[in-house]
Amino acid sequence: MPTFLFLGSGEFEPWSTEVETIALAGAVGDGSVAILPTASAAEGDHVFERWGQMGLAHYRDDGVPAAVVPIKTPGDARRDEFIAAVEAASMVYFSGGKPSRLAGVLRDSPLLVAIHRALDRGAVYAGCSAGAMVASRVRDAGGRRGTSWLFGLGLVPHVSFGVHWDRAARIPGAQWWMTSRLPDDTWFVGIDEKTAILGDGVRWSVHGRGRVTLRGPGEDATYRAGERFETPSP
């Protein structure tokens, strides 16, 4: 089974060390983390490099080997040396930024194929903010605009993920708009800031400071750190 680690915000901060340690303990690979700040590339090289350095410092403090894989464009996602680095790692970590940018780089790329191969052999896909959102189900073919995330790549094919979910609650109508337009057979998981979920796509555990909101077929519930929930395939 694949392993996913999704964070609502707060990548490369001390609060996430515990759940990352749990995830890496069961991961298959060379023991390293491949850091991909791809979603921030549109904001300029200085932002991309800052996120990369934050990741390196975080894992250095935790005693975990890590390297930045500098994928910024669709062309980069076809480079053999970058694909090899992703395939070898125990954890492939996409930090935050613009989900549309990240999805555009990954969609139909050899890198995405490599990520699936890594998951199949036991690596962890970790994503914070945009990195979590692109794991959502693929938009239905021919569906009207807004019925599912346009940037979902289907890593978890029956779930859509929202991030910064507690912040979204402070924007009138934002949560309703995002959840009311999802297909009826889709689970929705809203992850608060500085909160994470770890699981295999069906069974999840909650970690961090906030809550996780689950909505789906016959379900409307919230969960906190130490609790578990499921998102079974329809």
Features from the language model and the residues they span:
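C-terminal and late-domain segments of enzyme folds
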Residues: 1-30, 39-53, 58-60, 139-141, ...
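A short acidic, amphipathic alpha-helical/loop segment
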Residues: 19-22, 81, 114
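General beta-strand structural signal in soluble alpha/beta enzymes
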Residues: 6, 67-69, 93-94, 125-128, ...
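A residue-level signal for conserved active-site and pocket-lining positions in enzyme catalytic cores
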Residues: 33, 92, 129, 161, ...
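Residues at the starts of beta-strands that form the adenosine-phosphate
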Residues: 31-32, 65
